[in-house]
Amino acid sequence: IPLRLVGSEMCIRDRCKKGDILSKHDHVIFVLDEGMELRYNDVRKFGRMKLVDHDDYKNQLPLSKLGPEPFEIDYLELYQKLKKKNKAIKTVLLDQSIMTGIGNIYANEICYQMHLNPYTKANVLSKNRVKELVDVACEILNKAILQGGTTIHSFSANGIDGLFQVQLKVHMQKHCPLGHEIKKVMINERGTYYCPICQKAKR
């Protein structure tokens, strides 16, 4: 089940009884044991669902095209991949075939913490910088996981808001922690927040 932008799964403790009112965005309900059910809720209907054999699911799209997560990727492997990418690092961070699990919010935060301009070409990063990228990605994702994620707009897991949004340094912020004005630009059609002072472009 690729959840896409705002899809979510909610595990409901009590099974729906006759006459109960469902959310209008509950599209699929899985009836589980012990009076439990799992509801698939998707406000904008971006998500997808496909029934596959358990032994073959990793060979199905889009899973078969996903790269490793930051927690498991070897930085030298990532370095070799980035050497072939003459694209902005912000765009490459969102390419799930290279490294999976980094969305737009976290890509912005990773670039800021590294003092890395989002327009920087991925293929100019040194091995040390790529190692730093992996370390920073893991650090930020771990913090977000511990805080229950980042609740922006309509998404919350299990009906509970995450708390990492209060720790965001640049994404949807007006000023960075040092007080500099944040600039918002579009890179490959994705909203990109960065600090032109802290993340100066290399010349």
Where are these regions (language model features)?
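A residue-level signal for conserved active-site and pocket-lining positions in enzyme catalytic cores
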Residues: 12, 30, 41, 103, ...
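A short, charged helix-loop
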Residues: 46-87
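Short histidine-centered catalytic/ligand-binding loop motif
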Residues: 19, 62-71, 120-127
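Short, surface-exposed beta-strand-loop junctions and turns on beta-sheet-rich folds
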Residues: 13, 45-47, 201
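A gly/proline- and charged-residue-enriched helix-loop-helix capping module
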Residues: 18-19, 23-28, 36
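Structured, non-catalytic alpha/beta "coupling" segments that mediate domain-domain communication
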Residues: 29-52, 147-151
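Basic, nucleic-acid-binding surfaces and adjacent catalytic neighborhoods in DNA/RNA-processing proteins
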Residues: 80-203
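Single conserved hydrophobic/aromatic residue that forms the stacking wall/gate
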Residues: 1-7, 12
